[in-house]
Amino acid sequence: MTKHGKRIRGIQETYDLAKSYSLGEAIDILKQCPTVRFDQTVDVSVKLGIDPRKSDQQIRGSVSLPHGTGKVLRILVFAAGDKAAEAIEAGADFVGSDDLVEKIKGGWVDFDVAVATPDMMREVGKLGKVLGPRNLMPTPKAGTVTTDVVKTVAELRKGKIEFKADRAGVCNVGVAKLSFDSAQIKENVEALCAALVKAKPATAKGQYLVNFTISSTMGPGVTVDTRELIAL
């Protein structure tokens, strides 16, 4: 048996695929899985009881994770004049206006999150076909269209993340690194869950958190009992 096969078998022996676990138990399972040579990301996948085809049931927002994601973000800010100077001072990795718009039109997307001042959105909006599919388009709902670029860049550095339901009503979000201690991972997941529950549309009927899975990059997907999460 190959090393890969042994690792997969070892993972499968750590938990019951058909069972739903408490959040703490699910994190323990991820921690007990055979290790790899890099620090894996802990991902959450949540199926929501919404109809994304309806405009009033499209979920998108942001949340500040108490312990950050463990990832060093490359932050881009669309701004001009004094706001551009503020963004540079705040530590944004890329700052510009029309020059950045043209660069992105040419296919460059080597950044993780984009922020824009309101006056830049007329030009930034033209990048929808490039930024939209990559979830990089600044939006007021996510807090990335703002006049306070200093505060926004600082929040992103500290662990503010965006979440968005796709066309199937599923949110996929990286919430931590596996090297975080279990309590830190749990608190980050709980913060995300609280934000998702708060974002529940008034028109959404029936069960809201339909399915909740937590996984690591090279590890299993462990189903979490949603009854615990709804109570947060």
UniProtKB/Swiss-Prot annotation:
Entry GO terms, CC: large ribosomal subunit
Highest taxon above the source species: Bacteria
Signal sequence extent: none
Any single biological process term in GO: regulation of translation
Keyword annotations: Repressor, Ribonucleoprotein, Ribosomal protein, RNA-binding, rRNA-binding, Translation regulation, tRNA-binding
Molecular functions (GO terms): rRNA binding; structural constituent of ribosome; tRNA binding
PROSITE patterns: RIBOSOMAL_L1
Record-linked NCBIfam families: rplA_bact
Family affiliation: Belongs to the universal ribosomal protein uL1 family.
Quaternary structure (record): Part of the 50S ribosomal subunit.
PANTHER family listed in its UniProt record: 54S RIBOSOMAL PROTEIN L1, MITOCHONDRIAL (PTHR36427), LARGE RIBOSOMAL SUBUNIT PROTEIN UL1M (PTHR36427:SF3)
Function of the protein: Binds directly to 23S rRNA. The L1 stalk is quite mobile in the ribosome, and is involved in E site tRNA release.
Protein name as catalogued: Large ribosomal subunit protein uL1
